[in-house]
Amino acid sequence: MQTGSEKQAPFDADYFRQHTDEYTIVDVRNTSEVKKKPIFHHAINIPLPELRLRLKEIPLDKPIAVHCAGGYRSAAASSILEAALPDNLEITDIGEHIKSF
């Protein structure tokens, strides 16, 4: 979902699907949701309510893709990350596309 931020990148689902290893994927669903239905096995699970406290767990060496189950939490998480992380870091909210994975 584009928010108008300069840090948001357009999302190319086909490219992402083939190159997930090029991204740090942050899954902001609750831990119980992730255990029940993992989507990306190499994703970092940081539930949205814990995100501000656990920012240091997110590597900054790759673009960041943020997702939840449907888009609401990932939009909020993307805004938090955009405000807290370096300006040159690409952050993409893939929440609205997650059901295609």
Segments the model singles out, each with a brief description of its role:
Residues M1-T24, V28-F101:
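Rhodanese-like catalytic fold shared by cysteine-dependent sulfurtransferases
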